[in-house]
Amino acid sequence: MRSRYDEAYTRSLRDPEGFWAGVAEDVYWERRWDRVLDDGRPPYYRWFAGGVLNTCYNALDLHIDRGRGKQRALVYDSPVTDTIKTFTFFELRDEVARLAGALRRQGIDKGDRVIIYMPMVPEAVIAMLACARIGAVHSVVFGGFASNELAKRIDDARPRLILSASCGIEVNRVIPYKPLLDGAVDMAAHKVERCVILQRPQGPAALVKGRDLDWNDFVSGAAPAECVPLAATDPLYVLYTSGTTGIPKGVVRDNGGHAVALKYSMSAVYGMGAGECFWAASDIGWVVGHSYIVYAPLLAGCTTILYEGKPVGTPDPGAFWRVIAQHGVNAMFTAPTAFRAIKKEDPKGVHMTRHDLSRFRTLFLAGERCDPDTLLWAREHLHVPVIDHWWQTETGWAIAANCVGLGMLPVKPGSPTKAVAGYDVRVLSEDNQEMPAGQIGSIAIKLPMPPGCLPTLWNNDAGFEKSYLVKHPGFYLTGDAGYRDEDGYLYIMSRVDDIINVAGHRLSTGAMEEVLSGHPDIAECAVVGVADEIKGEVPLGFVVTKAGVSRSDGDIVKELIDRIRQQIGPVAGFKTALVVKRLPKTRSGKILRGTMKRIADSQEYTAPATIDDPGILDEITDALKGAGYAKDRP
C-alpha cells in the first residue's frame, strides 16, 4: 500500500485549520467550535475555541450509545496479586459514573483539582475518568513518590481531595503508600480537605479521623453523575514532569485538542480500530499511561490493558508474551528498557516461542532513545514491525513516528522516522539557523504546535516561556539534540545537555551508546561526559553484560574501546568503560546519566525522586572509585 503520510503531513502544515477540523469530526461535540485555532495571543494558542464536549463521554458513553457497551473496555492483569479482571464499556461507565457522583456529593465541581496517588489498579483509571466526567482537573502522581515530592505537587495544584490507596505491590514487597501520603499532607502548606483511601488486603492502612474516608464507604449510595459539558479549552489534567527540582512543572492538557489528537493518533500512528486490543506497558503516573493506557484507547473504542507487573520477574521473561497471547493484544507500546531487560534474561527469545502471538502485529517503542541493536533483536524474534517513535510529556502524543495507519515508510533502525502531522520540526543551530542534513543541532518545533500539546504550565506562564520558548523565538524547545538525514528521517541522539565537548569536538553520547550496544555481549549501556584537565571532557562508558556472559571484563572493555575507535574515530577520546551489574534508572526506565556524571566528577547530587532503586548509586560510586573517579565521595 502506498503511504499516505506525505499527503497528510503536507496538508497539516499548509492548512492546519482545515486538516484538524476534518480530524475533529471523529469526536462528539456538544457544540462545535467557533474557531479551529485561536491564534490571537501568541505564543498561547488555543485549539477548537468555543467548542464544547466531554472527554469521558467520548471515551465511554459514546461507544455504549453506538452499540458497543458489551465490548471489553479495560482488562486489569496483575501478576503481583494473581488477579485478572475485565470491564465492559457498560461496567466501566457505571463504575466511573458512581465515583463521579461520590465526588459531586463531596462538593467537588468543575475546575476543582483532585490528586490521584495510586498504584496500577482499576480504581486509578476509574478515578481519572470520573474527574473528566464532572470537569474536575486530575493530577496523577506516581504511586510511591516520596512525601516531599508529593507535598510540592499538593502545594502547586492545591487539590480539594486526594484519591489514594493503602499500598502498592512490587515483585517481592509491599510499599505502604499511606505513611507517604500522611507525610506529604503534613508537609504541604495547602491543606487538603479529604483523602479517600482504597484499602488493599496486602497492606491495610489506618485512617485519620475527620480527614480520611474508606473508598467503598465514599462511593456507597452515590447517585451516578452525568457528563458535564466543558469548553474545549478547559483543562482536563495537570501532570508534573518527573525529576524536577524546586517547584515542579505542571504540564496542562486541555479537553478538546487532547481528545482530537489522541483519537487521531490511534488510527494514524498506531493503526488501531475500534474493538481491537492495545497495551501500553507503562504506569498511569507517566504521560504514556495517561495517553495510551487510559484516554487514547478508550476514545478509539479499543480494549486497553492495565498491567500491574514487570517485564521480567513476574514470573519470568515471558510475562509480556503471556499477556499478549491471553488477552489478544494487537499492538503494544513500551520502553526500550523493558526489552533490554527481557533480552538480558532471555537473549535467544525462547519464552516468545511458548505463547501464541498470532494476533500481535506491531510493537512500538518510546520513552528513551532506542538503540538499533534492541530494535533489531525485537524484530528478529517477534517477526512483526518494531517502530521507534519519539515524544514528550509536554506534547502528550507522538512528535515523530512511522505512521502505521497511513502506510508504513521504510524503517531505519535508530530513527523514529519522520514528524507526525501538525509538527513542523526543525534542527537548529545556536543562532537559530537550520542545520544541514547529517549535522547535529537542537530539535525544535515551530509554533503553533498541533492539538494535544501543552498550552502552558499550571499557573506558570512565565515558567512556560522560560523553559520552552526563549531559546529559539517562535519555536518550542524540545531539549533534545539530533539531526535529519538526506531522506528527511529524524535521529534523536541525546538530550542537548548530553552533547559533550572533547577537545573542541562536539560529540553525541547517544552515538557512542549505539556503538557499545551493538557489541554481542552487551545488554545495555550508558555514556556520560566527565571532566578532564586536558580535553575539557572525555566520554566514560557504563555497560551491563547479558546473562550467561563469562568472558573477562578486561577483554570486553578492550573490544568496546576498539569499536568506538573504529566506528566514531580516535577523536571521541573513548578510553574507559566500566562493567557494572545494573544502571540507575527512574521508575519509567530513563537512565540517570546526569547523576552518574555528577558522581564521577565528585559533585554534589540529590537522588531524583523518581529513582527506582537508590542502592544502585552506591554500586556505581564503588565502580567509579575503582577506576579513579569519584575521588571525593565518602
Locate each region found by the language model:
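Conserved AMP-binding/adenylate-forming core of the ANL superfamily
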Residues: C56-Y57, L74-L129, A146-A151, L207-D217, ...
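Conserved pre-ATP/AMP-binding loop-to-beta segment of ANL
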Residues: K70-R72, C195-L198, V208-Y240, I247, ...
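Structural core segment of the AMP-binding/adenylate-forming
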Residues: L129, R133-D217, G328, P336
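AMP-binding/adenylate-forming catalytic core of the ANL superfamily
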Residues: V141-S166, L181, A325, M332, ...
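Conserved AMP-binding/adenylation subdomain of ANL enzymes
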Residues: A259-C277, V287-A331, K344-V350
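Gly/Ser/Thr-rich phosphate-binding loop
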Residues: C302, N330-T334, K343-P410, D424, ...
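Conserved ATP/PPi-binding loop(s) of AMP-dependent carboxylate-activating enzymes
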Residues: K418-G422, Q433-Y468, L507, E604-Y605
